[in-house]
């Protein structure tokens, strides 16, 4: 069984219509709400924690919301997973958590620190917390590629914040 836990009802409905698979179960909830996580977490073996506020401007304008989702939400997922004896939780992070210069990177770096600290206190519970950092995934929501393409198509200059900046790109192709 695969469980989808998200606060986005529309995306869940789109997935339900597209996949039409009785082995996929859908749970409406928010990582900020531990009780809704607990409801979905019962009997789960593996968790891929991808919930985040990841748009840099949104996190800059609403840093408290970024902390609530990216840091406290991650803590809720980890606590629930440990309580329900999940085998492994994979926390998805970002390359922007390395030497962060904005609120999104800072909150993701802090969520990684929360994960590492909680890993030290698992006390042989059988649950494992691990994380991975993604760079710019081409064709993903929030990727800089569509912005660059739109700027080129409309004859605008490509916005580069620093000419010495390096961006790492990865594709979903194998």
Locate the predicted segments by residue.
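Conserved glycine-rich Rossmann-like NAD(P)H-binding loop of the short-chain dehydrogenase/reductase
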Residues: 1-11
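Conserved residues in the N-terminal Rossmann fold of short-chain dehydrogenase/reductase
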Residues: 6, 27-28, 68
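Short alpha-helix adjacent to the SAM-binding motif of class I
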Residues: 11-17
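Conserved Rossmann-fold cofactor-binding substructure of NAD(P)-dependent oxidoreductases
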Residues: 17-20, 25-46
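Conserved beta-strand scaffold in the Rossmann-like NAD(H)/NADP(H)-binding core
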Residues: 26, 91, 131-133
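Conserved Rossmann-fold NAD(P)-dependent oxidoreductase catalytic core, especially the SDR/UDP-sugar
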Residues: 49, 53-113, 117, 127
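NAD(P)-dependent short-chain dehydrogenase/reductase
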Residues: 103-104, 109-174
